[in-house]
A protein has these predicted regions:
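Bacterial N-terminal signal peptides that target proteins for export
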Residues: 1-8
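Terminal domain-start segments
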Residues: 21-110, 218-229
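Acidic/hydrophobic-patterned starts of short beta strands in beta-sheet-rich repeat architectures
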Residues: 73-76, 118-129, 178-183
Length: 229
């Protein structure tokens, strides 16, 4: 009888221990769940990588000018920097062809002018250039309109081709149009003059536009040597 009571007490004790363990495990699970609920949630949305468009490099012009004459126009510009540049002349208004002309020049464009230099009622476009370096030698790039149809290149003779003109010539030219004539001026250097200081005065050349065998050309018409001031 005593053994039966002892067995009953053992069973009751085991049941009590099992209940406590279940309660402890349940509390532990509840605590863990509550801890997870209290953790800060990552609300940051995943961002897709953005692709930036590469910057488009704008065309840069070292010279740009538009000239107009009685319904015909010329867009003149140079691209690039440094001594070698690309000269572009884009005509507009001709009936047959308005194809652009591209030329490589040594130096820079100082100015561009339009005028009727042969009194035919149609324009000539003249681009004045200056070479790089201490001499700054000048040149004229010119085109003459063939009526309303198109335009053709005009020949401009270098000073070195004319014995009288080249005496004392060391560059530093300037160009202009006066009374429908092309004018070129440059300082005259005497023997021994440094490039930075001429003492021989100024030579002024007036050109006229004439018809040549293959194309129109400029011819020196008047030459005047002006004394130093």
């Amino acid at each position: 009888m005593k053994t039966s009571k002892t067995s009953i007490y053992l069973i009751i004790a085991l049941m009590a221990m099992t209940g406590c363990n279940d309660q402890t495990e349940t509390q532990s699970q509840n605590t863990e769940t509550h801890s997870q609920d209290n953790k800060p949630k990552d609300t940051t949305k995943s961002k897709e990588p953005t692709i930036e468009n590469p910057a488009v490099e704008k065309e840069t012009y070292s010279f740009q000018k538009t000239l107009q004459f009685k319904g015909i126009s010329f867009d003149v510009n140079t691209k690039g920097i440094g001594s070698l540049r690309q000269l572009v002349i884009q005509p507009k208004g001709f009936e047959e062809t308005n194809k652009s002309v591209e030329l490589e020049i040594d130096g820079k464009v100082t100015d561009a002018q339009v005028a009727d230099l042969n009194s035919d009622g149609f324009p000539e476009v003249l681009i004045f250039t200056q070479s790089a370096g201490s001499g700054s030698y000048g040149n004229v790039i010119a085109f003459s309109a063939n009526g309303v149809k198109s335009m053709s290149r005009v020949y401009f003779p270098p000073v070195s081709e004319n014995t009288k003109l080249k005496k004392g010539y060391m560059g530093h030219d300037s160009f202009s149009i006066k009374e429908s004539a092309l004018i070129q001026e440059f300082p005259i250097y005497k023997e021994g003059d440094p490039n930075s200081n001429s003492t021989g005065g100024t030579r002024r050349i007036q050109y006229k536009l004439v018809n040549g065998e293959a194309s129109r050309k400029f011819v020196a018409d008047k030459i005047i040597d002006l004394p130093s001031k």
